[in-house]
Amino acid sequence: MRRVVFNQKGGVGKSSIACNLAAVSAAEGHRTLLIDLDAQGNSTHYLTGLTGDEVPVGIADFFKQTLSSGPFAKKGKVDIYETPFDNLHVVTATAELADLQPKLEAKHKINKLRKLLDELAEDYDRIYLDTPPALNFYTVSAMIAADRCLIPFDCDSFSRQALYGLLREIEEIKEDHNEDLEVEGIVVNQFQPRASLPQQLLDELI
């Protein structure tokens, strides 16, 4: 199972949800990997406690390899970090991801992440993908590589408008790149049961 957690709106609890789901999966005995694709590295910090120069280069190094050429270039390898939790590993993210993005887009490397996950499939039962709060190279790569998409959602009118746009984008990615991708569910955050708007939004989603 490959699950991407994504919303193009920031501050909706995306990294927290991805880390907690991965931790629960590992606690249940599943061999679990979380790949952090967000240059902010929140999931990396949550799961390793590392910051700044302490963080292994991780997924950025993998994408750099895809840009390399020549007979001796290292290809398709990724460093996997063991967390303090049993059965839970992480591929870390660093700020270098932001610098790599335009180069990766120019070289059309959008399917490289899916190939990596195919290679890791024998080693892990569940793979979670934490993404940046933008519809960019990394999030599209993640949705091409995943088979399930989980969307964190804040109960406000702005989030509702963004959600419908996101669902259209996911459907387009499904049609063009990944017919196996399914929206698994919407995780409602900051729900206030006594307020009328959140209840209206929840009824609409249901």
What is each stretch, according to the model?
Residues 1-206:
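P-loop NTP-binding core
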